[in-house]
């Protein structure tokens, strides 16, 4: 009986330790790899040929490339047009592809539309959970603007693209000449706030993956959050969800 108890206790201890490691794990850096180069006025960057399921959503003339802002931290950038730079920052949980329909309607002979994807989303690098801070994302996006050697721009941002994009520009305040703010704010909260219960639950690495990647895939349900479900068909959900 004592032997059975000790074996059971050992199994329980191993299970508990394993569960604790899983539920608190931080994750690891995943760095994407491109092919070839893209040459801009600012220099030469690593090209990233888009897979067909993503490329089919874009019109002609797009450039797709990485800007390595820190060792292993690559930001995927979509760019189209020539002229005055317009920096367009998406929010969570989408990517630079969010602005593809707006870009289609803008005069690309007069505007250079620059659409970076935040680290952790789309084709950009994936980082440990602990590195997802507003300060880090501000610095990384500012690194993109710096390496592109922009001297002035108009900014457009929505959702978390507001605090991140405006925060990035706060690090280089001379860049901004105008702003178009959508559903967003100027900065991150300056005081502690309580997360909603759903946000608090999915913040946990294991539970978040189980819920949002297994039981209730977030991108599969995005159409229900839109005013017009037809604007978010299965191939668009795939566009945002597959790289993540």
PLM regions and their residue ranges:
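Conserved HGGG/HGGXW glycine-rich cap/lid loop of the alpha/beta-hydrolase fold
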Residues: 73, 78-123
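N-terminal Sec-pathway targeting helices
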Residues: 1-13
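Flexible "cap/lid" subdomain of the alpha/beta-hydrolase fold that forms the substrate-access gate
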Residues: 16-64, 71, 75, 85-87, ...
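Sequence-pattern detector for short linear motifs
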Residues: 5-6, 28, 103-104
